[in-house]
Amino acid sequence: MAIPIGIQLYSVRNSLAADPEGTLNALADMGLTRLEGANHRALTEDGIGFGISADFLAEIMRDRGIEIIGCQINPLGLDRLPTILDFQQKIGNSRIGCDIEFYPYGDLEYVKRRADFFNQVGRVAAERDMEFFYHNHFQEFQRFGDKTVYELLMEYTDPDLVKFELDTYWAYRGGVSPIDLFEQYPERFVMSHQKDFPADAPRPLNLFDGPLAADASIDMPLFLELEEPAEFAEVGTGILPIQDIIDAASKLPNYKYMLLEQDFASGEELDSVRTSLEAFKRYENIAL
């Protein structure tokens, strides 16, 4: 299967803030018309984030053939969920997900409670023929006893209600191969995020091999402290085995999209996207 490529709009967040119309048109000009939103103001807003209004979104989707193939929601709560899903369905989006979660070290009961919550969200989405997905960072690969949090989430969540969007970069940063995860849980993944890791990064690829203790209590302040812009690279410019990742993802039965997500760009955001897109064109099993 040739994998369709899209983009998580967080990759161009600063460009969107300055010129949303110009940015979305620039992405469409590159052929990037499959977009994933990131609504970080879900307490008060229903859309795809970045200040993009519903009217403008409808207009540019119609004029440029853009489709919204997913949207991360933060904060994620049951009270606002029906209203948010109403909006997403109106724009033709059938997937919503969480963007970031933290788990107090060793607290298995907390993991279970969050898994139960994800099942509830997934059930509400499924009642509308929509999907709920879980997006990871590195902290899900911390071991709580003999299993990682990610393994526990796979175990505690209902496969029919909770899908997964694997951020392959962050899996490596947690010391786990995304290829192994694809092979271990082939039915669970519907999308993935792709970026790269520079060869000259100041710290090891696996954060647990250097700056992070195995028993660290990871929260947002620590995450932000560990997030180093110099440790991100455009697709095809670093050391990650991206063709192998693509090949593994292409074999998954429920997998739909590989999304470029550049947490930090080496230069201007749209130039960064162009660099990654040109790299994607050189890989096999890719559909632009």
Please describe what each predicted stretch is.
Residues 35-59:
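Glycine-rich, proline-tolerant flexible connector loops at the mouths of alpha/beta enzymes
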Residues 1-33, 62, 89-92, 147-166, ...:
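Histidine-acidic metal/acid-base catalytic patches
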Residues 11-13, 39-41, 74-77, 102-104, ...:
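Active-site-proximal loop/turn and secondary-structure-junction residues that shape catalytic pockets
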Residues 17-18, 45-51, 143-144:
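Conserved glycine-rich "GG(E/T)P / GGGxP" loop and the immediately following alpha-helix
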Residues 12-13, 46-47, 74, 110-111, ...:
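A generic secondary-structure micro-motif detector
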Residues 25, 34, 63, 67-164, ...:
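Active-site acidic/histidine proton-transfer and metal-coordination neighborhood
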